């Protein structure tokens, strides 16, 4: 059985010609700088035409040097308004579906996860197109992309995903790496309609908060997992200070234990220190784990 990292981000810039872009605000620059330093990249690399290739090659090297066989590489859709038009001033990043699909064709280590806003006028057509090209998963960030997944007009979109067996990886809980446009959509209850339609849904970050004042949606997630057998969670970024409280229920809850999948949230930097401080690993394990420099491992 292959070991898969279900939650790996691609980052690209407008200088590469791949159609990607990244917008770093002054408020978020320190966090982006930290992520780049962890990859041995200078902040200035974001402006270089070679950045996409540098980021791709580092990721491939990390995967190949790890116990992971492949990673789900996430596209990043634009932010859309409720009327289906692009919200041009919103969003921090864009990674086209075609770029992720192409990388997956070129490298066996990548599994393509596309991103389609269901409010797009061509959402159904784009979903068909991506499925034909080998999409293995769909990723969305409801609170960052302005997606009310419970809107009844999206039901045909969710039905098609259910019929074709395409799983949905949906951000749940707070978010501070990317711009949030509707904080209410961080609630896992936002995923009720796709669940009712039969979509296999993975609640990214297990509905944990990203900041000290974010609501704790873990109890909501557990309640929904009792109600829906097609709801899962992932471990992405649970080894950061603010989300680490979610580690214990993911490890110890009988309900969650069999329905939690692995995700690194690469390139978000994590540390085993938080599992140690939460009493989930001992000091010897922490000492051993902190020697691992490969973020995918």
Tell me the role of every PLM-derived stretch:
Residues 75-183:
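Active-site gating/metal-coordination segments in enzymes
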Residues 4-8, 70-73, 111-114, 138-140, ...:
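Hydrophobic faces of well-ordered beta-strands that scaffold small-molecule active sites
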Residues 54-63, 119-130, 218:
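Short, acidic/polar
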Residues 9-14, 78-81, 118-122, 145, ...:
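Active-site environment of divalent metal-dependent phosphoester hydrolases
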Residues 62-66, 130, 161, 194, ...:
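Generic structural signal for hydrophobic
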Residues 1-74, 80-91, 289:
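An N-terminally biased module of ancient metal coordination in phosphate/nucleic-acid-related enzymes
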Residues 200, 207-297:
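H/E-rich (His + Asp/Glu) clusters that bind or coordinate divalent metals
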Residues 43-48, 80-92, 177-185, 209-217, ...:
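Short, flexible/disordered intra-domain loops and linkers
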């Amino acid at each position: 059985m292959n070991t898969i990292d279900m939650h790996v981000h691609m980052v690209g810039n407008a200088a590469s010609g791949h159609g990607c872009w990244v917008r770093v605000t002054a408020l978020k620059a320190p966090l982006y700088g930290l992520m780049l330093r962890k990859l041995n990249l200078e902040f200035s690399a974001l402006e270089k035409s070679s950045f996409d290739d540098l980021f791709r090659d580092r990721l491939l090297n990390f995967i190949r040097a790890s116990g992971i066989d492949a990673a789900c590489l996430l596209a990043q859709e634009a932010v859309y308004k409720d009327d289906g038009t692009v919200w041009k001033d919103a969003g921090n990043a864009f990674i086209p579906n075609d770029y992720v699909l192409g990388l997956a064709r070129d490298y066996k280590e990548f599994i393509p996860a596309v991103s389609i806003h269901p409010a797009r006028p061509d959402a159904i057509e784009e979903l068909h197109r991506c499925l034909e090209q080998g999409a293995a998963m769909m990723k969305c960030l409801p609170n960052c992309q302005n997606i009310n997944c419970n809107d009844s007009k999206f039901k045909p979109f969710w039905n098609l995903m259910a019929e074709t067996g395409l799983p949905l990886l949906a951000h749940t809980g707070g978010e501070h790496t990317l711009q949030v446009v509707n904080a209410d959509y961080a609630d896992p209850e936002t995923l009720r309609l796709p669940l009712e339609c039969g979509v296999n849904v993975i609640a990214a970050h297990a509905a944990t908060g990203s900041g000290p004042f974010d609501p704790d949606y873990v109890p909501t997630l557990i309640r929904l997992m009792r109600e829906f057998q097609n709801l899962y969670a992932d471990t992405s970024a649970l080894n950061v200070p603010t989300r680490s409280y979610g580690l214990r229920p993911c490890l110890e809850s009988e309900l969650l234990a069999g329905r939690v999948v692995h995700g690194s949230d690469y390139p978000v930097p994590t540390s085993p220190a938080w599992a140690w401080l939460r009493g989930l690993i001992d000091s010897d394990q922490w000492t051993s784990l902190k020697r691992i420099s490969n973020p995918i491992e």
